[in-house]
Swiss-Prot record:
Domain of life: Viruses
Keyword field: Host nucleus, Host-virus interaction, Transport, Virion
Protein family membership: Belongs to the influenza viruses NEP family.
Cross-referenced SUPFAM superfamilies: Nonstructural protein ns2, Nep, M1-binding domain
Chief location category: virion
Function: Mediates the nuclear export of encapsidated genomic RNAs (ribonucleoproteins, RNPs). Acts as an adapter between viral RNPs complexes and the nuclear export machinery of the cell. Possesses no intrinsic RNA-binding activity, but includes a C-terminal M1-binding domain. This domain is believed to allow recognition of RNPs bound to the protein M1.
Protein name (database record): Nuclear export protein
Quaternary structure, from the entry: Interacts with protein M1. May interact with host nucleoporin RAB/HRB and exportin XPO1/CRM1.
Organism field: Influenza A virus (strain A/Equine/New Market/1/1977 H7N7)
Motif Nuclear export signal: positions: 12-21, 85-94
GO cellular component: host cell nucleus; virion component
Location in or out of the cell: Virion; Host nucleus
Amino acid sequence: MDSNTVSSFQDILMRMSKMQLGSSSEDLNGMITQLESLKLYRDSLGEAVMRMGDLHSLQSRNEKWREQLSQKFEEIRWLIEEVRHRLKNTENSFEQITFMQALQLLLEVEQEIRTFSFQLI
């Protein structure tokens, strides 16, 4: 993962953690946790691709990796829908910018995970 993506993740997570969205702050914390989890998962897939010999250990260590991959795509789709929903419902420009950048980052992460997974299949 390049340094721009790392700083984008860190910047978005920091800004999202500073948002006060009233009763939905628990939902926002959940989104932040899921975004961090997806980042780690994407990083681990990228590392496995870099060490193609890891493919066999990845498959033998975790026979359900395709199921996990499917679950991660479901999480990404849910997060994308949640971010779009929040983007439509906020009038605060700080929140709009943050959610637009989070949406762009989620789409990039989805594409990277898809690319890595095709290389591993």
